[in-house]
Amino acid sequence: MNGGSRLRVAIFCLQYFSSSFCLFKKRPYICNTRTPKPLNNAQIGGRFIFIAMSLNFNKSYTTPTSIVQLLRERRLGIADESKALHYIEHIGYYRLSAYLYPMLAEPKSNHRFKPQSTFSNAMSLYRFDKKLRLFLFNEIEKIEVAFRSAIANIVAEETGNIFWMTDASMFANGAKFLRTITLIEKELKSSKEEFIKHFKEKYSNDYPPAWMLVEILPLGTVTRIYENIANNALRKKIAARFGLPVPVFSSWMTVVTLTRNSCCHHTRVWNKENAIMPMQIKKTARAWISSSVSPKRIFYDICILKWFLDIIVPRHNMKTHLKNLLDQYPNVDITAMGFPKNWEEEALWK
């Protein structure tokens, strides 16, 4: 092919031999750059053809003025053009488009807005999402601090090894440990924290003790360190502090980390699907939510945060803050966030 587009086609014919493969019989399996999906009623076994396609991106830059004109042509109400231009220039249309998308009429590929859709509605949703991120981050901070404290102190207390975080014998997977050491050395080299400077100047040890390291490492790294601890009894004791079995605790801390990162990087969170599905707790003596609540949406993540806070800060006011935020924006579709109709009647929220 020539011109503005390029097509790459890879065809693989594979034979199903064992249960370790999941192939689709007599059906094409076609994907773009995302996860491939089988067409129609694909079946296990037999052969399949895998076709991977990619095209050159050929869209051109559009000025804010042209964008406003295009939005009007697509039937979006814009009461104040100067304000719309200001927001597009200072926020960026690409970011704002995520808040315009829910207002598109079906089929959305026609790019026509539903009746009564306005630019002001999109900005209101944008502000709600911003306040939601601030709310979430404020709650996550308490969980993050508690987790850092638990992992550093419990392992040191149980083993008597204050340098356990840089001791290869403490970990199950050597390759993962080496990657962690590389990250630790990188953080130590770049850290401007006074306590790290003081340690380097005063002591000859290669690495600081765990309670110092845990303060400079990213939350995701700390979570992976937890997962790689060889002694399962230690992992159980850390998870038990938060009322959870090891697999669920590990899964939920990953969700907390991803949500935290979304908040830090100003990513849309209000109606976004979880990149990683949180593990669902099956048996618990503590109040939790019904199985009908979707683990794909942010409400499930909010429930996870509340679980942790009920243990870490028993007299917290998370529910009050959440209700106040939702009351400020009554036009937000909370079902798109995964909220069930009577969410306050769930055992966790009573």
Q: Predicted segments — roles?
A:
Residues 266:
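Acidic/aromatic/glycine-rich contiguous surface patches that form carbohydrate-binding/processing clefts
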Residues 2-6, 10-258, 270-350:
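Extended intrinsically disordered or low-complexity regions, especially N/C-terminal cytosolic tails and loops
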